[in-house]
Amino acid sequence: MRKMAILAAAVALLLVVVAPTGAASGPTIVELETVASGLTAPVGLTHAGDGSGRLFIVEQTGQIRVVEVGTLLAAPFLEISGLLPTLNAFFDERGLLGVAFHPAYEGNGRFYVRYSVPRSGDPGEPCFGTSRGCHSEVLAEYRVSAGDPNVADPSSGLVLFAVDEPQFNHDAGDVAFGPDGFLYFTLGDGGGANDGLADSPPSHGPIGNGQNIETTLGSILRIDVDHRAVCHRGRTLQVGTAATDAHLRHGDTPGACAGDTSTALYRIPSDNPFADTTGADEIYAYGLRNPYKFSFDDGPGGNGALYLADVGQNLFEEVNIIERGGNYGWVIREGFHCFDPFNPTTPPATCSDTGPSGEPLIDPIVEYSHPGSGFSPEIGITVIGGFVYRGSESPGLVGSYLFGDFAKAFFAPSGTLLFINDPTGPSPTIEQFQIGLDDRDYGLFLKGFGEDEDGEVYACGSIALAPTGTTGVCQRIVAEN
């Protein structure tokens, strides 16, 4: 039987506590060293793994910027703003959302980006008031230019995967290579609220997208981009969809295998949980709402675990360790708690502890709640996933999972930097970093994290809520004690 909500809350309180500033060991103090400023909505940072020491910063507005020898280069590495929808000046979750460099990038020059495209090809297509939905989410491959390592070849873009999204939000968008050499990327549940179940009729189907293994929405996906001539039982690119439109914009056309309508642009790993069975072949794990950020603990001493932060709705934010084939509960649960789409601010006392096919629902390792929710600890409204620290500048943080929260309130630049000092231990706890000896506020909307080739971790944020302005910064997190 499903745990009682009171029991779940008790378990959560045992597992998740914010260490008070006055704890006997004292706060963990960090300084933030700015490596790039003047950015527009920086949502992430990474490296190419080529020994160059360069940092690559993703701006939501469609640019990838390069930091080389401590200097932010004026010219972008990649500029694809012309492919994006017109982003809302108030707030938007669409845009350029993630980049991952191939493990053999130094030799093959290949990298992969996640971004949004308008379904009709018109950048101004509205998100609302249309039965066609809002936009499509795309995974594309690009290559570095032959003449300049700091500039990509814009004509090399090749769309590998695209899926229609009914709303502008819950686009997730992170992308990374795993220790197995396969490419992982995330998709949200399609947006709106309650996974569509409170709509009449349910706009995301009778069980919502998160619990529906026939759709890739609400999932983390895994594909093999190194064997693209092999047919798979994949998604079809229909004429007139954004996927086909994007191919044509990039100067390519959808391919096909003999006797199959697959695009043959990637292969499905044979041990994907639904490979050649019922369910979407690309799914690695599901039951997710808005898995905006994830990472692998693949640095020195790491165990390769996949950490994923799933953004909650009204009450709870969560961090998960992802298992192949795992069902992480949305829309049956939010965090450790039962979820009622018709009354989302009051967790039901009971609910199913299995998915539609009887598979067990997997709990997060930690959760926290929104300010004013009445559930402890109250931290913020949107979890931003980070990295397990495997660097050398802050030895006291080695093995800790560094992450944070977007803001304490939607309109206030009030992000929070957090960590879990023993994320794989029996009782992981959330702790808050103290910024500086003066204990100052972060003072930004936290929009993403990043990691360099040496395992140092960075936080990226902006004063602006929307993808506008140039108040964005990326800063290295360095422990002072």
Language-model regions, residue ranges each:
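Blade-loop segments of beta-propeller domains
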Residues: 73-101
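Bacterial N-terminal signal peptides
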Residues: 7-17
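Surface loop/turn motifs at the tips and blade-to-blade linkers of beta-strand repeat domains
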Residues: 34-40, 78-81, 89-91, 161-167, ...
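Beta-propeller domain segments
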Residues: 58-61, 89, 94-96, 104, ...
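A short helix->beta-strand "capping" segment at the edge of beta-propeller domains
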Residues: 24-40, 153-157, 362-365
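Asp-box/WD-like beta-propeller blade repeats and closely related beta-sheet repeat scaffolds
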Residues: 125-176
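Beta-strand-rich domains and repeat architectures in extracellular enzymes and scaffolds
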Residues: 34-62, 380-388
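Conserved beta-strand position repeated across blades of beta-propeller domains
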Residues: 43-46, 100, 176, 295, ...
